[in-house]
Amino acid sequence: MFRVGSWLYGKKPANASTQSLDSLVELRDPATLILNDDVDGAEDGLAEGTSSFHNLGRGVVAFIRATLGFEQDIMRQASERLNEAETTASVDQHRAQHNSQAPNTYHSAMYTPGTEFALCQAMAQLMGAVVGVLNESLTESIKGFYRLRKAYITLDAILKMEQKYLQESRMATPIESAAPGSIPLSMKRQGSSNLQSSSSSISSAKIKKAASSATTLAAPVENTDLSERLTGLNLSSETLAPGDVKEASTLGPADMLNHDPDSDIFHNQIDIFVHSGSNFCFGILLLLISMVPPAFSKLLSIIGFHGDKERGLRMLWQASKFHNLIGAIAAFSVLGYYNGFVRYCDIMPDSIPGQDEDVQGYPQERLELLLAKMRKQFPKSQLWVLEESRMCGANKNLDRALELLCGGESSPLKQVEALRLFERSLNAMYLHKYELCAASFLECFELNTWSRSLYYYITGSCHLSLYRNALDKDPAKAAEHAELAEKYFRLAPPLAGKKRFMARQLPFDVFVARKVAKWEARAKDWKVPLVDAVGVDPIEEMIFFWNGHSRMTDEHLLESLQKLAWCESSANKTWSREGPEEKAILKLLRAAVFRSLRKHSQAKDLLEDILSQDRNLFKGHLKDDWICPVAHFEMAANMWMERPTYIAIHGGSKEFTDPEATEPADSSKSLEYEREKVHKCKEYLEKAAKWESYELDARIGLKVTAAMEAVQKWENTHPPA
């Protein structure tokens, strides 16, 4: 362990490299326990250590708990631990630089002395930033952006060392490059000062000043846009030369280290820690920034953040190769991205089958190998069972996905168990297993406090579906489900707004409160029970918002069409009273199902009917103002899926009534046909991206951002002749 006093009082300095190695070795067992869901055991294993690595480990434990559960008390604990880890790492970094010439000190061929502690600082800052942004306090959210900026700069400096090492290794003679531990002179001269300046460039005084400013501004939280408060955080001029940040996110694979863990350059644990850690942290940062909705991405670029999805994914894949805690967390991030985000989005870059270099499609074989490796490495962890279930769902095997989450052991970690239950609830919803879905969401309510209004809302929606199913067959059963549906619908709105993200209400909380208020107003106006004032099946609406259609087989999709048909059936006594808004929702949901069934002409006909109407019909008090922008996105998705390239990978349309949907036989005409489809897709996306603020715009914005990036990539690889 480090003893700061021996350095402060001028005694013989300890060998920092040896102590770093000892601490990293000590952390192996606790790290394994974390990924085997034994967080309490990991806490015990970390309790005795006082090094920066042990402090960071304790911060990681709290961070995992905080981000899996979103509970405020755990977030506060994580923030405190991460602050402590950042402080001790800063002290140790300065000492490592001071003692860099001590006898027997290890000198990395890639990194300057103290880089491992700079990475510890950056990791603590990055995790602290995430906790801050997830915090309900606007002040903490703004502090989080400062920490994010500091971590960004430090990680960029570390990765520039790797780039410099690669460049100088290519120019070195075989004898020079074979010498272990040799450091290019230019790195010795420049690296240390660059790291030190980057890590201290944003002073704590500035953070305190921003926090104070944020506190002053925080009174009218509901009426103030966060973007207005962050526009003053443009820090690029203080820390990087113009263009440096942009340059950091535009490097190609040739500028990145992609060696395997058994490569000779990774013979030292310190180098392994720095390389895997910096690749994971910067990779996740670049990926997340690239995914944010259009309005927020503009704000991030103003204050100096630039995402790069492809580079971020390559870095995460690289980090996942390593057999340590960082490698496992990188693997979890990779699997979560592909099985969650990619399957949530409908317009993504085309996959290139059989190419490991392809990172923006869905590299199924590569993902299966990664998951198998993780399950073998951490056999007791329910996290990897959860990821296997997600992978099954992503590949349209929902029955197996649900089976994996219904049996077997539960996780001793409450937050993991809550995730498992939530995923089980969604899968049951996609499969129209209403009883299981309702029971599972009620279990989520007991385990997690994040979005309890949504849990009650979906539970009520399940009982509404059961009520409609039993209405003609079993009136007593129907009355029972009607009572439960009304109970949970009325319980949901008072819970909305209890949790906040960057001082704002959660999007689905706003949605739930408005929907129930709309139904209550209709019930009063029509003089009917609440359950008869609902309109289009809210479960089908939820399936759409969670993009369950992409996980459903044709059989499940046809069942959704049957559920939607109830609205227009004789069983629905209030359909004749419905206006254009509810009828547009029905058309939109049907169009989404038809698109997933690859019946694009039917989908487009329904969407064109919506878009031909006056947009003002869908605006106003208690109205579903999301209908038109979402219809534009759905049109874009149909255009994307009608391209010859998409058809070659995923199969063709299941209808042949639309002459435009027939792919030209001539290759040159085929490219022009595809270009036309991409152009139309882009036009619809631009309209959706530029739409005024609407309910759930952040959620839909994620899909729009990913789609615009996919279109841009297609245009870059297919320039006009």
Curated annotation (Swiss-Prot):
What keywords appear on the UniProt entry? Cytoplasm, Nucleus, Phosphoprotein
Its GO CC terms are:
cytosol; mitochondrial outer membrane; nucleus
Note down the stretches annotated as region Disordered.
Answer: 177-199
Q: Does the keyword Phosphoprotein apply?
A: yes
Q: Can you say where in the cell this protein is located?
A: Cytoplasm; Nucleus
What does the record give as the function of this protein?
Inclusion body (IB) resident protein that interacts strongly with lipid droplet (LD) proteins. Involved in LD-mediated IB clearing after protein folding stress, probably by enabling access to the IBs of an LD-stored soluble sterol derivative that acts as a chaperone in inclusion clearing.
**What family does the entry list?**
Belongs to the IML2 family.
Record's subunit section: Interacts with lipid droplet proteins.
Q: Can you name this protein? A: Inclusion body clearance protein iml2
Q: Which species is this record about?
A: Aspergillus clavatus (strain ATCC 1007 / CBS 513.65 / DSM 816 / NCTC 3887 / NRRL 1 / QM 1276 / 107)
Organismal lineage = Eukaryota, Fungi, Dikarya, Ascomycota, Pezizomycotina
